[in-house]
C-alpha cells in the first residue's frame, strides 16, 4: 500500500509539495478551502501566472519589502531553470 499524505493548503507551496509527493508514489490528498487551488498564482504577471523570476537572488531579497532574508534558502536553492523544468516536466507550457 502506498504512503498516504494530506497536504493542507493549495497555494504554490502546497501544490508543489503534493505533486512532489505524488511523484514518489504517495497517495496524496490536497485540501484547499477556496474553490480553486493556486488562486494567488492566477493574479501574478497580469494573469499569466508568473512561476519564477530571473533576477539575481540578491535583487530578489533586496526587493522584498519586509525581512527578505527569510526567502534566502528558497531563492538560492531553487534557481529559475529548476522551476521551469519542474513545470515543463508536468506538461505546463511556459512563455
Language-model features: where?
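A general secondary-structure boundary signal
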Residues: 2-3, 88
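N-terminal Rossmann-like FAD-binding beta1-loop-alpha1 element of flavoenzymes
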Residues: 3-30
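Conserved N-terminal/central alpha/beta ligand/cofactor-binding core
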Residues: 35-95
Amino acid at each position: 500500500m502506498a504512503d498516504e499524505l494530506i497536504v493542507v493548503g493549495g497555494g504554490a507551496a502546497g501544490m508543489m509539495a503534493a505533486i512532489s509527493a505524488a511523484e514518489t508514489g504517495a497517495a496524496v490528498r490536497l485540501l484547499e478551502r477556496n474553490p480553486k487551488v493556486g488562486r494567488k498564482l492566477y493574479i501574478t504577471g497580469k494573469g499569466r501566472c508568473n512561476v519564477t523570476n530571473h533576477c539575481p537572488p540578491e535583487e530578489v531579497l533586496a526587493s522584498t519589502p519586509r525581512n527578505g532574508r527569510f526567502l534566502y534558502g528558497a531563492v538560492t536553492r531553487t534557481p529559475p531553470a529548476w522551476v521551469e523544468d519542474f513545470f515543463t516536466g508536468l506538461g505546463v507550457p511556459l512563455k
